[in-house]
Amino acid sequence: MAASKTTIFIVFVLCLSCTLLVNISGIQATSSTLKESLTAEIKPTKVDRCKTDRDCPQSHRCQKDFYYGCVVGECICRAV
């Protein structure tokens, strides 16, 4: 009984150490990978306050198949 517990413990420790070794020595980003990445700028948007959907502006500013709706007091574009 003690031998089987010891064997299970040793196998567990080996699996855990292999997992940690793979995670620590994982793939690192190189300079060539970084050059291919995309960057995006985030711009703050003006928030339209509302009480109902009718308080929101026309939906032509939203993407196709979206409309302005009032959610928690703010006008947001929602999917149809």
From Swiss-Prot:
Q: Which organism is it from?
A: Arabidopsis thaliana
Would the keyword Disulfide bond turn up in this protein's UniProt record? Answer: yes
Q: What is its main location?
A: secreted
Keyword list (alphabetical) reads: Antimicrobial, Disulfide bond, Fungicide, Plant defense, Secreted, Signal
The entry assigns this protein to a family as follows: Belongs to the DEFL family.
Q: Where in the cell is it found?
A: Secreted
Secretion signal, residue range per the UniProt entry? 1-29
For biological process, the GO terms are: defense response to fungus; killing of cells of another organism
At the highest ranks, the source species' classification is: Eukaryota, Viridiplantae, Streptophyta, Embryophyta, Tracheophyta
Q: What is this protein called?
A: Defensin-like protein 291
Q: Which GO terms describe its cellular component?
A: extracellular region
Cystine pairings recorded for this chain: 50-70, 56-75, 62-77
